[in-house]
Amino acid sequence: MPKSGAHQPLVRHDTDDGGETGQSVKSLADVSEEEIDSRMSRRSSVIADLLSLFRRSSSVLVRPHTRLGNPNFDDDDDEFDEEDDKEASKDRILKKIQQKKEIIQKLRGQPWYMKRKRRTLKVAQKHLQQQEAKVSKARLYKAEAGRRLTQASRWLDNLKIYLIPWEAKIRKIESHFGSVVSSYFTFHRWVLGVNITITFIMCMFVVIPEWLADSRTQFGDDRYNKTKAIKVMPPAVRARADELSTVWDFGGYFQYSLLFYGFYSKETFFGETIKYRVPVAYFFCNIFILGFSLFIILRKMAANNRRGTLSSGKTQQYLFNWKAFTGWDYTIGNPETAGNVYMANVIKFREAINDDKQKPSDKHPWIRFVARVLTNLFICAMYVFSIWAIMQCGTLKGEHFFAQNATAITISLITLVFPNIFDLLGKIEKLHPRNALRFQLGRVLVLYILNYYTLIYSLMLQLEHLQKEKNASDNPISALGHPGDAIGRTIRETVLPRYPVDNNPHTYYSYAPVTTTPIPATSSWTTVLPDFGPFGVYNPKASVTKDDTVFSSPVVETHMFGPNSDWNETTVNAASPTGATTRASLRMSQGGLCWETIIGQEITKLVTMDLYMTVASIFLIDFLRGLACRYLNLYWPWDLERTFPEYGEFKVAENVLHLVNNQGMIWLGLFFVPLLPMLNNIKLIILMYIRGWAAMTCNVPASQIFRASRSSNFFFALLILFLFLCTLPVGFVIASKTPSKSCGPFGNQSFFYSVITDVLHENLDKTLVNGIKYSLSPGIIIPVLVLLSLVIYFLIAMVTGLSQANQDLSFQLMVERTEEKKKIFELAGGKKKKSKDNTFGKQKPKQLLPPPTKGVSSDDDSQHNRSTAKSVSGRQFVPSLGSVSEVDHSTGEEQSSDSESTTSSLPPKLSLRQRFLVCIGWADPNKYGRHDDIEMEEGGGRLRELSTGSETDSDDEDSEKSNRDMSYRTAIQSFDQNSQSASASSSKSTTTAPSNSEMRIEITENPLHTYITPLRIEKKSSASSSSSSHQPSSSIEKQAARRLLQPISTTHNIRYGVATVENSSQDPTRPPSTDDSLGDPALHEPLWANLNPHSSYTSAMMSPIMNEVMSNDETTDDEKGRLIPDRPPIPHSPRELKRLKREKDQQSESGSKPSTPRPPRFRISMSPPRKPPSEKNDSDSSNRKYEMRVEKSPKKPKKSDND
């Protein structure tokens, strides 16, 4: 063999025109090093340098061009000289130009002398100029522009990674806690992006137009006078606007700002060129945001679902393998987290094993049942207490802090404390860890939903109470009359004392004279037309006048006369009741109740209170507990880090539910607080940093891993649920409630949606508006909803049917693939005689074949003998046919044919779910039994095909052999000339009686077909003939493998000859030795798998890829591409077919072998024989080395002459 690293020359076989005898050729071993050096000396050093640079080029996707011209071309020609190749396309030339430019760029970094670099650069530039001359300048500029654009896009993609917010922080958390914890922060960032989008929409279409309209309003304008009551802060409110209680309740400056619903006016904004209706924009933006949120969530879920469906169905078959190979998180970089994940995987395997095993019966099941019942009763009691507490907080009245913020504080405490109590109660139930996590999530979700709707109900009750108070305040308390409407009169009753003589009492009345003073008129009367007011305004709503008239009343003086000493003074005590004073909103005192702002203030306080409670809980529960566990552990009686209270866990599921609940509050309060998403953005940013700091400082990964990556749509399903829950109260308010008359953009409407009808009336015809009203009536909407429900049901049924059909097709493909693999492995390792036919996991009765008679072809016998497999112990590469089945045989226990027939006659037993589906009409009751019958029939059909495959006639068997061995016709060698006569005589008669002889193969190959003929070799003794009758027919393939794997010799007779096996006990599969003999008994019989020509090992060794792997030469890709010639052309013309037929007839008449066949493209040569296996030397040691060389096919063979 040549030395490693040298360029090995090609081996050429020179044949004469007649093809009678082949001249001797040189083998690879006969090529001297001087000849190799002489060939290498003809190669230019500059070209070698360019080749080395070209071999290191980054353009690896460009495949080298294979020259298909004359096979006798010189391999040492200039590889870059392609000027004569006029058939090259422009794209190919551009690729070559790009390659040469890369070579020039890499030339500077090569460790060469400067003279060598300059010389190489000169040659490369010259070739580059030649190639560029073949392409127009515009094409070059276009290619260069495309390349620069690709580089710019890659640079932008790399820059985009640095622009993603908190990407580095999330990756750091991922390295410490894994992808499960980082998925929460990724979801947190996604929710923040949604809130930023919602804020942008509300600011662009609602907030900014209202702010522009107010900025253009001046003091005394019509808009200023109409909006003064809702936009100008009264002096009494301004005096308390800076107090902490006012700011905490979002009053004062917050109340009279763009933050709440009541600040927006119902006036139309008249710009310089446009007329913008803010109420219409307010209504449509809220509806659009809800629809937009639903769309992006569904879009994200669909994308995750598409990625999830790419996984194969094998994940449901090999559960433990998938758990083992996919259970590790390779993003972890923290040893502590790695230990937690390791233990989690161990627990996961234990759980899976326990699930598969039969669960033992519980000794005391009633104790567990009672504990679970009590636990669920206690949890239900907690739900009732939560509802009662929220309802009671809504009825509290008072001026103190707790009364004003009772609802927000109560909901925040319940949200914070109750999930931890649920977790403790769940441990009493002793559920499976996976089920315990599911129950925990379900209970927390139910708690959030109850709190959500209890809050809405409490707010509605407060609204009704305030509405009643407002209606009571509308009644007049006192009536003030005009001063000129009554005449003042003073009456004095005097009781005179009785004189001593005459004690008769007398009563005297005195009347004060009343004088009337004329009042001059300060203003003249104005004549007003019926349709116009006093100011010339059309159809005024109200008119306010001011009267400065001064009234003067007469002064009446009374004087007491007569003695008063005998008057008796009587004191009368009278108590007048005083009414209770209640705190009312300023909007109510100004003539109306703005209940939308009140609800918005409550929701805003709830959102901000949740932020305060979350930060406080992180600081107290996580941070202080972590400090105590860290620094008090040395002085405590037990281990604080491992028992109680231990470090806080980062609970992904609870944190996700908390985030989803917060987003539901945002969707609920968006209609009443347009800038609530902006406040939520600030809250989410604060929580991102707080939770990230707590995770890296105080928390440890949860012991029970929440697999969010396996069900990535879990987060978004919760968002969909809360979005649906928040649309119900908002829709109820829009459809049934009456807007406030004193504030908001819908103050002059009877309903919130009336603003749409007003716009339609103003811009459309009355007939068209009436048609729209009729189309939106309940008589049309209800049938449409029913129709949509039926369509949805039909689509669901269709999708279910398609999914079932998809599963059936996947199962069929799996079965077909399994059968094909079985056939391939049978061809690779020899057909194995099946004592038990195992199809679809069920045992079939053994089919006994009758013994062969004299009229049966020997090919059938050889086929049956070939199916007999020897022991597979010790084999290295022969796979087991039982392990290739991809069907999950979970219930494939062995059953007899009698039990199968009995079971098939009985109706299938349906589960509870199947009965329910059959009851509601979603499933066919016959499909369950019919599906099994179809599988049994298909399995039986395939079994009959496999069992009767060996009983076909000899013609079908020969065609099957020839088709199977077509792929090996370039590798299997022919036999020598000495066995041609015997092979010709035996090939003429195919149906002969079997005799005590040994079988061997003759391979006759022409450009169209490959003929495989079994031959018989008569034994020299009767004893040997009797033993040879029982010799397995796999020795035929062993002989072919021996001819294939024998060392390369210098003559055709040795190379294509065949040695007759004289003794059947001699192992024909032993490796070749230095004396070209196959008698070395070192190779054990099980290693026949490596020598089988149909085995996958031999196929792999004959593949062209092994030429690159096993060879030690350093030839370039271009050189290797030229080494593989095209296959010989298949003749199609009548002349060629006649010539081939004539050659065949001549060969059959002469009884001789045709001319020397075309040499194979591949040759496998082996090193010296393998050593016997030992402790130091394994049977698969690297001493055995396979090398494959590609040879050139000779010229087109001409017509051969017979001897």
UniProtKB/Swiss-Prot annotation:
One function term, GO molecular function aspect: mechanosensitive monoatomic ion channel activity
Residues passing through the membrane, by range: 191-213, 276-298, 369-391, 406-428, 441-463, 665-687, 714-736, 780-802
Skewed-composition ranges (Low complexity): 898-908, 973-997, 1022-1035
Residue stretches of biased makeup (Acidic residues): 73-86
Compartment(s): Membrane
Annotated region (Disordered), positions in chain: 1-39, 64-90, 826-908, 927-1039, 1059-1087, 1112-1203
Gene Ontology annotations for the cellular component aspect, listed alphabetically: plasma membrane
Coiled coil start-end: none
Keywords tagged on the record: Glycoprotein, Ion channel, Ion transport, Membrane, Transmembrane, Transmembrane helix, Transport
Keyword Transport: yes
Start-end of Polar residues biased regions: 865-874, 1061-1076
Pfam families with a match to the protein in the record: TMC (PF07810)
Glycosylation site positions: 225, 748
Basic and acidic residues: bias regions: 927-945, 1133-1147, 1172-1203
Membrane topology of the entry: Multi-pass membrane protein
Functional summary from the UniProt entry: Probable ion channel.
Family: Belongs to the TMC family.
Protein name per Swiss-Prot or TrEMBL: Transmembrane channel-like protein 2
Classification of source organism: Eukaryota, Metazoa, Ecdysozoa, Nematoda, Chromadorea
